[in-house]
Amino acid sequence: PLQVNSLSITPPTTPQDLAIAMGIAPSDIVSASLNGSDVLGVGIGSAPLGTFFPREGNTFAILSTGLAESADTPNDSDSLSYDLDGLNSADGNDMTQFILTLHTPEGINCASFDFAFYSEEFPEFVGSQYNDTFTAEAPLNVAFDSEGNIISINTVFGVTANNGTTYDGGTTL
């Protein structure tokens, strides 16, 4: 069973704290911004979430279109929803955005990061207008599943249930 530590997800004091939670050295951070996103949609995890995080170090960043602090609660509800203030997509749906500008060391021309995509909308909203997505733009989207699809509930490749979080579905790394 999922072990829940109510203190394992905390809100970041600054956007830079999210970057540091991802293992980015403070000296490599040029700027960090939530670009108007509701701070309730982001968190710093300090205990295992599902079977993946943290991968390195003791912390990781959480970006959510709902309450980030809910990510480590038991999956014992039919619905998990919260309307965030702040940014919305063109369709009026909640959106959380984290913008990083990093110092690039001389001779380095690539970067990598691990992510897992979790959603409460799986499987009941697959193929519907409700379509959680994840993108990472550098400057164009670089987050795709192994079939080349954008990461979303409607593509569902690699999304499985019983992922050790409060969410109904999630991807592997």
What feature does the model see in each segment?
Residues 2-173:
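Aromatic (Trp/Tyr/Phe) and Gly/Pro-enriched flexible surface segments
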